[in-house]
Amino acid sequence: MTIEDLSKQVRKIREEKGLTQYNIWKQGMNFGTVIAIESGKNVSLKNFLKYCEIVGIDVTLEEKE
């Protein structure tokens, strides 16, 4: 999965939950960071995880086979 794939997926989930980028910003995330995450730009893992927490996305890791 690429960064672009991740960005499309998290945006899709946000939209399905009826949340806007403004809603994410209101929860304390920099608006530019929200745009960067959803545009597939490189962001810190800390910011990505914060975005996922706000949206309600569970991030899990699986060992590659």
Features from the language model and the residues they span:
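A short, Lys/Arg-rich alpha-helix, primarily the initiator
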Residues: 1-16
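DNA-recognition element of transcription regulators
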Residues: 42
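Short alpha-helical DNA-recognition segment
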Residues: 18-35
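Helix-turn-helix DNA-binding elements, focusing on the entry/boundary residues of the two helices
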Residues: 10, 20-21, 45-48
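The alpha-helix within a helix-turn-helix
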Residues: 14, 24-25, 52
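DNA major-groove recognition helix of helix-turn-helix/homeodomain DNA-binding modules
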Residues: 46-62
